[in-house]
Amino acid sequence: MCGNNMSTPLPAIVPAARKATAAVIFLHGLGDTGHGWAEAFAGIRSSHIKYICPHAPVRPVTLNMNVAMPSWFDIIGLSPDSQEDESGIKQAAENIKALIDQEVKNGIPSNRIILGGFSQGGALSLYTALTTQQKLAGVTALSCWLPLRASFPQGPIGGANRDISILQCHGDCDPLVPLMFGSLTVEKLKTLVNPANVTFKTYEGMMHSSCQQEMMDVKQFIDKLLPPID
């Protein structure tokens, strides 16, 4: 997946129970792997959808005293005005676009692919969807933020995904990525894409994690946008 890091293992995959006619690519958070999310999607799967949960390359993370861990890009700080790893974010987005291209080669059109992620992975999924020329079905962005927000226009984006459907979810007790980040992100997203297609759901008492209700909302979003076609 990552041309610059051949040691990254192959993604965790929940294969479709029959011929795959759609796919979900979901990116884990900092320090995690794709395995836990693959298990979560196995619990809400639909038989015609393939779920792909790639693993981030291991790299030193400034926020964590340069300790090496799975990370899509470097995180320097968690405050709204922290410096961002612009080149790392852009390279990571290119790697995800290559993964989407691979699925298109495998026979799944890009408009039958939903991109998503949790925390750092959710941030990367939003950035990738808003900058790619591949028309996607939607984005499911959990407990996250929009990286490099100043790089986006004041008005709507051009390109393939100006009408993309976005489900953004956040816990109202998140101590790591505060709910305010989610609220600011959703307001920005509504200026970049058709605001009628942006949904923001919050979960009472949820911290920086997921919950059963959220996963059911994610399933409903996926199944609505990626219905069976045969």
UniProtKB/Swiss-Prot annotation:
Main location: cytoplasm
List of catalytic residues: S119 (charge relay system), D174 (charge relay system), H208 (charge relay system)
Keyword DNA repair in record: no
Reported regulation of activity: Inhibited by palmostatin-B, leading to impair depalmitoylating of Ras.
Residues forming coiled coils: none
Keywords: Acetylation, Cell membrane, Cytoplasm, Endoplasmic reticulum, Fatty acid metabolism, Hydrolase, Lipid metabolism, Membrane, Nucleus
Summary of pH dependence: Optimum pH is 7.4 for the thioesterase activity.
Location of the protein in the cell: Cytoplasm; Cell membrane; Nucleus membrane; Endoplasmic reticulum
Cell membrane among keywords: yes
Gene Ontology biological process terms, A to Z: fatty acid metabolic process; fatty acid transport; negative regulation of aggrephagy; negative regulation of Golgi to plasma membrane protein transport; protein depalmitoylation
Pfam families the record matches: Abhydrolase_2 (PF02230)
Family, per entry: Belongs to the AB hydrolase superfamily. AB hydrolase 2 family.
Function (record text): Acts as an acyl-protein thioesterase. Hydrolyzes fatty acids from S-acylated cysteine residues in proteins such as trimeric G alpha proteins or HRAS. Acts as a palmitoyl thioesterase that catalyzes depalmitoylation of proteins, such as ADRB2, KCNMA1 and SQSTM1. Acts as a negative regulator of autophagy by mediating palmitoylation of SQSTM1, decreasing affinity between SQSTM1 and ATG8 proteins and recruitment of ubiquitinated cargo proteins to autophagosomes. Acts as a lysophospholipase and hydrolyzes lysophosphatidylcholine (lyso-PC).
Quaternary state and interactors: Homodimer.
Name the record gives this protein: Acyl-protein thioesterase 1
